[in-house]
UniProtKB/Swiss-Prot annotation:
Keyword Glycoprotein assigned: no
Protein name: Probable molybdenum cofactor guanylyltransferase
Name of the gene encoding the protein in the UniProt record: mobA
Keyword Protein biosynthesis: no
InterPro entries in the cross-refs: MobA-like_NTP_Trfase, Molybde_CF_guanTrfase, Nucleotide-diphossugar_trans
Listed EC numbers: 2.7.7.77
Catalytic activity reported: Mo-molybdopterin + GTP + H(+) = Mo-molybdopterin guanine dinucleotide + diphosphate
Organism expressing this protein natively: Trichormus variabilis (strain ATCC 29413 / PCC 7937)
Residues given in the record as Mg(2+) binding sites: D97
Subcellular location: Cytoplasm
Pfam families given in the database record: NTP_transf_3
Xref: NCBIfam families: PRK02726.1
Length: 207
């Protein structure tokens, strides 16, 4: 665990959701707290990169430190700001809106980091639209080329990753990458968790 630091990005505008996604509760737990608790089970230190640390100070966030983000400039710049504080070889990068994230999957991925080829700067899930940059692992040495890309005006994770070697992370199930971006997404995830909750008494027909 000492060789892994986690960065959680909580700097999005949440415009499609209409409220701060990080504070939306699923099964009574704010999403940011849920993601950070999982990150803390895999990493010694968890950095939360956000322009609004005061919004989240009341949450239960073990082993977490805030990195104030200079405005909402997008996830790539937020990652670069967090990466500047990292001392470990590997960093786990997570978005704050992953309600189906599973700790055992991240721990298994982390346990296999030693087998990632030396030339790879990251190991990430891959899907039809490209890499999933906000749920995976990066080597700290990706910082110089990342900063160069940003200084040249780059803001896209996908465009940056095209220029580097990245190893594919095997997904046990694609649903762990589910993002809670809209009220419809929230309704879906809350409905699924409600279905999993035990019902102490059967519902009467016609009630």
């Amino acid at each position: 665990m000492n060789n892994l630091t986690a960065i959680v990005l909580a700097g999005g505008q949440s415009s499609r959701m209409g409220q701060d996604k990080a504070l939306i509760t699923v099964q009574g737990v704010p999403l940011l707290q849920f993601v950070c608790n999982i990150a803390a089970s895999c990493a010694e230190i968890v950095y939360i990169v956000t322009p609004w640390p005061e919004r989240y100070e009341h949450l239960v966030l073990p082993r977490c430190q805030f990195i104030p983000e200079a405005g909402t400039q997008g996830p790539l710049i937020g990652f670069a700001q967090g990466l500047a504080q990292v001392k470990s070889e590997w960093v786990l990068l997570l978005a704050c809106d992953l309600p189906k994230l599973r700790v055992e999957v991240l721990q298994e991925w982390a346990a296999n980091l030693d087998s990632v080829p030396e030339e790879a700067i990251a190991t990430l899930p891959h899907h039809a639209k490209g890499w999933e940059p906000l749920c995976g692992f990066y080597r700290r040495r990706c910082s110089p080329p990342l900063l160069e890309f940003i200084h040249q005006g780059g803001r896209s994770f996908q465009q940056w990753l095209q220029h580097h070697s990245v190893q594919v992370l095997a997904l046990p199930t694609p649903e762990i990458l589910f993002n809670c971006n809209t009220p419809e997404d929230l309704a879906v995830i809350q409905g699924e968790f409600d279905d999993l909750s035990p019902n102490p008494s059967p519902t009467r027909r016609g009630a």
